[in-house]
Amino acid sequence: MGSCQSNENSEGNARNKEIEKQLNADKRAGSSIVKLLLLGAGECGKSTVLKQMQILHSNGFTEEEVNEKRAIVYNNTVSAMCTILRAMDGVLHLPLENGQKEAEKAIVMKVQENGEEGEALTEEVSRAIQSLWADPGVKKAFEMRSEYQLPDSAKYFLDNCQRISEPGYRPNDQDILYSRVATTGVVEVKFKIKELDFRVFDVGGQRSERRKWIHCFDNVESIIFITAISEYDQVLFEDETTNRMIESMQLFNSICNSTWFLSTAMILFMNKKDLFMEKIQRVNITTAFPDYEGGQNYEEAVAFIKQKFAELNLNPDKKTIYMHETCATDTNQVQLVISSVIDTIIQKNLQKAGMM
């Protein structure tokens, strides 16, 4: 993404410093603002949940934000195809079924080689991506995606390539929800509900990012921990020897039982339930949990994973874990879950204030 990425990084650094400054000021002032912290391992869907909150409670996206996301959508679309093509060559050793499409492969790969994947898709590039996406060899490589690192949004953007490449394209809310750029530092959304001011923070999910920020949030009202239950057969982007589900459970364990968060409510979003529902029919969760003896179906497998997370809570008498199965890209479903979460928080605040 070239200069687009570097500009985002510099702007992000300035924003991170401002947020940290405000957090420290809030702490000194003993602020009554309701602070929620989104945590989870990389690519679990935290940023998507935060964007949903922005759509539902914070007047959506500004024109400037929409323009920024346009470049990210272009990038995600080109990168998705390039990632599949590279995996076909280097990991899967799969050829294109139609050898005549090698020229189209070269067209798409050249966009990334030139650092132009954040630019508007030309008609030539769009046609090449759509043609490659229809190739049975590419489809087979997509089905084998757990063997390499491919974002969950790849299918969405490749399916929508023609629309995305149209002149005057403007990302809609769904495009923005699916768009993906790794969170570095802290991203914040503010909104007001029933006279309460909410501040929600998304902390970068990769290991290095988490270490930088966790100490800043010892006074948050609740932690929304997000785990991608569909990733039980995948490894980390930053460590390809570690199973993503196991990493998520280890992180949950450290947060749930941390001295920083002894009195903080824990809300667990078991995210990507739609992908889990599809995958469980093909891949058993014994991949991550050899002790699982239940059926290869959604209900039994999810119940088992819930129990695994519940067992990590070392203080169940004092700390309740509220669990929700979610699909972060489904606005209607997320709205119901977030409303339930916010109602719970409001009730707790009223109890603290002695009004219940």
UniProtKB/Swiss-Prot annotation:
<feature type="domain" description="G-alpha">
    <location>
        <begin position="32"/>
        <end position="356"/>
    </location>
</feature>
<dbReference type="InterPro" id="IPR001019">
    <property type="entry name" value="Gprotein_alpha_su"/>
</dbReference>
<dbReference type="GO" id="GO:0042048">
    <property type="term" value="P:olfactory behavior"/>
</dbReference>
<feature type="binding site">
    <location>
        <begin position="202"/>
        <end position="206"/>
    </location>
    <ligand>
        <name>GTP</name>
    </ligand>
</feature>
<keyword id="KW-0966">Cell projection</keyword>
<comment type="similarity">
    <text>Belongs to the G-alpha family.</text>
</comment>
<dbReference type="GO" id="GO:0007188">
    <property type="term" value="P:adenylate cyclase-modulating G protein-coupled receptor signaling pathway"/>
</dbReference>
<feature type="binding site">
    <location>
        <begin position="271"/>
        <end position="274"/>
    </location>
    <ligand>
        <name>GTP</name>
    </ligand>
</feature>
<feature type="binding site">
    <location>
        <begin position="177"/>
        <end position="183"/>
    </location>
    <ligand>
        <name>GTP</name>
    </ligand>
</feature>
<dbReference type="GO" id="GO:0043025">
    <property type="term" value="C:neuronal cell body"/>
</dbReference>
<feature type="region of interest" description="G5 motif">
    <location>
        <begin position="326"/>
        <end position="331"/>
    </location>
</feature>
<dbReference type="GO" id="GO:0046872">
    <property type="term" value="F:metal ion binding"/>
</dbReference>
<dbReference type="GO" id="GO:0060271">
    <property type="term" value="P:cilium assembly"/>
</dbReference>
<feature type="region of interest" description="G1 motif">
    <location>
        <begin position="35"/>
        <end position="48"/>
    </location>
</feature>
<keyword id="KW-0552">Olfaction</keyword>
<feature type="region of interest" description="G4 motif">
    <location>
        <begin position="267"/>
        <end position="274"/>
    </location>
</feature>
<keyword id="KW-0449">Lipoprotein</keyword>
<dbReference type="GO" id="GO:1990834">
    <property type="term" value="P:response to odorant"/>
</dbReference>
<dbReference type="GO" id="GO:0031683">
    <property type="term" value="F:G-protein beta/gamma-subunit complex binding"/>
</dbReference>
<feature type="region of interest" description="G3 motif">
    <location>
        <begin position="198"/>
        <end position="207"/>
    </location>
</feature>
<dbReference type="Pfam" id="PF00503">
    <property type="entry name" value="G-alpha"/>
</dbReference>
<keyword id="KW-0807">Transducer</keyword>
<dbReference type="GO" id="GO:0001664">
    <property type="term" value="F:G protein-coupled receptor binding"/>
</dbReference>
<keyword id="KW-0519">Myristate</keyword>
<keyword id="KW-0460">Magnesium</keyword>
<dbReference type="GO" id="GO:0031849">
    <property type="term" value="F:olfactory receptor binding"/>
</dbReference>
<feature type="binding site">
    <location>
        <position position="47"/>
    </location>
    <ligand>
        <name>Mg(2+)</name>
    </ligand>
</feature>
<feature type="region of interest" description="G2 motif">
    <location>
        <begin position="175"/>
        <end position="183"/>
    </location>
</feature>
<dbReference type="GO" id="GO:0005525">
    <property type="term" value="F:GTP binding"/>
</dbReference>
<dbReference type="GO" id="GO:0005737">
    <property type="term" value="C:cytoplasm"/>
</dbReference>
<dbReference type="InterPro" id="IPR027417">
    <property type="entry name" value="P-loop_NTPase"/>
</dbReference>
<protein>
    <recommendedName>
        <fullName>Guanine nucleotide-binding protein alpha-17 subunit</fullName>
    </recommendedName>
</protein>
<dbReference type="GO" id="GO:0097730">
    <property type="term" value="C:non-motile cilium"/>
</dbReference>
<dbReference type="InterPro" id="IPR001408">
    <property type="entry name" value="Gprotein_alpha_I"/>
</dbReference>
<dbReference type="GO" id="GO:0030425">
    <property type="term" value="C:dendrite"/>
</dbReference>
<keyword id="KW-0342">GTP-binding</keyword>
<feature type="binding site">
    <location>
        <begin position="40"/>
        <end position="47"/>
    </location>
    <ligand>
        <name>GTP</name>
    </ligand>
</feature>
<dbReference type="GO" id="GO:0007608">
    <property type="term" value="P:sensory perception of smell"/>
</dbReference>
<feature type="lipid moiety-binding region" description="N-myristoyl glycine">
    <location>
        <position position="2"/>
    </location>
</feature>
<comment type="subunit">
    <text>G proteins are composed of 3 units; alpha, beta and gamma. The alpha chain contains the guanine nucleotide binding site.</text>
</comment>
<keyword id="KW-0479">Metal-binding</keyword>
<keyword id="KW-0145">Chemotaxis</keyword>
